[in-house]
Amino acid sequence: MARYRCCRSQSRSRCRPRRRRCRTRRRRCCRRRRRRVCCRRYTVVRCRRR
């Protein structure tokens, strides 16, 4: 499971806060199944790139 926090650019209420937060310049909110997690580089193994 992803362990990233919600992106500041996106709505925090929509994203579920995780333990760690994205440590990348480009932070985007990816939604995996029913949960939305923050993806580093907006492209993570867990999240699909758009």
Swiss-Prot record:
Testis. One of its GO terms (molecular function) is DNA binding. The keyword DNA-binding applies. One of its GO terms (cellular component) is nucleosome. It comes from the Eukaryota. Belongs to the protamine P1 family. This is Sperm protamine P1. The gene is PRM1.
